[in-house]
Amino acid sequence: MPLSRLEILAILFGVAAGCATRFSIAGEPAAGQLHVGWATVDITPSARVVLDGSGYKRVTSEVEDPVTATVLALETRDGDRVIEQAIMISFDLVRMTKEVQDGLQLEAAKRLKDFDSSKLFCGATHTHCGPSISYERTGPGQLYDLSNETDVMTPQQYILLLYERVGAGIAEAWQSRKPAGMSWGLGHAAVGYNRRLSYTDGSAIMGFDTARPDFSHIEGSEDQAVEMLFFWDSGQKLTGLLLNIACPSQVGRKAISADFWHPIREGIKAKYGPQLHIFAQCAAAGDQCPEPIVRSRAEKAMTERRKISWKQELANRVVRAVDDVWPCAQADVQTRPVFAHRTIKMDIPNKNSYNEARWMPSMVPVEVHVLRLGDVAMATNPFELFLDYGIQIKGRSKAVLTFISQLTCDSQGYLPTRRAVAGGDYSAVNHTVGPTGGRVLVDESVKAINSMWP
């Protein structure tokens, strides 16, 4: 497919036309003694709340399983000199907002005098059964209209609960950091499935109808890797692990739930210790879902034979992947890794960015965090990012293993590929940033990652 006029302009103008990026790197990042702290915070509300993530209103106090926020504090030091810092937080929520992240950065600044609060960032697992933090959607006439509801915790009230509980968790994680080691691992589990179907006329839908006679193919690819970071104390006892999966957690329907992440956590803790912290991270997965499109009836029959739920089946697959990787990770622990953390402010072209008067694109401001930890890189973005973009970043990265964390720092909606836009339908038409902006996001993320390696 030929490039559009705007894409050609973005390439020609480079950063000037496509992205204003502000960060600096002074030489190769330094290695230092790693210090790690953890906290896991229960963010399950005790009142009725509106759940976010569906096209209809769901108000409930029913709890299928708890929703949590997991706080991971990282620091490297050379003696008493601090080299680098980060606090990252994973939420069992459908989205993250700039308001919530800004509020938690303020909480960190109030509570911690030896931490740069700009190096705190928050991401969401994209559970469709988490309490809403989008109060602009709950007014009269809006999708989640609460104007006639009584005894409901509003999103504004729930955000205050997050500030209080997670603020305390931030302090707990930071103040408990101790000398530690880290290792990475790579396993595999079939969790995410591409959910966009293409038909012979060139159209596409986000759905499950493969029985149509004009069904042609699944539009995009799938990534069945389970990327892992293990963290160990000074006695080489595991304290927690970060799991990165290219799939939103949206099996559940009506009750408060962390979705498949809950049985993943419980399964790992049952094998390796109840004290473990499990940090859930969703990779680029805007066109993915945890339900199989092809062989769906056979998959359902197999879970019925096993007498387990589908989310338990997904969790079992992930736990088996951890089991497989565990011995390799335990044998390669680093206590003095290279650690670098950059906060990047990007201005990315929006989907209607061609301006006839100025011949320049209008921009969407985006915050991205890029980290190097040993051989591993991590790059965040605030989108429901289609998988292809994540694969592009991973493929071009100098890191041995590259983690992508979507819906982090904010929520800017879907970022579809050019082929998805051509096919149309939900997720490919309701977006702020399109393929031109996706190209800029990839290029700038790769540039930031690769600048951390010689």
PLM feature spans:
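Trimeric beta-solenoid/beta-helix "fiber body" segments of extracellular/virion adhesins
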Residues: 3-4, 27
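Bacterial N-terminal signal peptides
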Residues: 7-22
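N-terminal export leaders
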Residues: 5-8, 393
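Short, intrinsically disordered low-complexity segments
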Residues: 4, 21, 194-195
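Conserved beta-alpha junction segments in alpha/beta enzyme cores
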Residues: 27-277, 281-284, 288-302, 306-313, ...
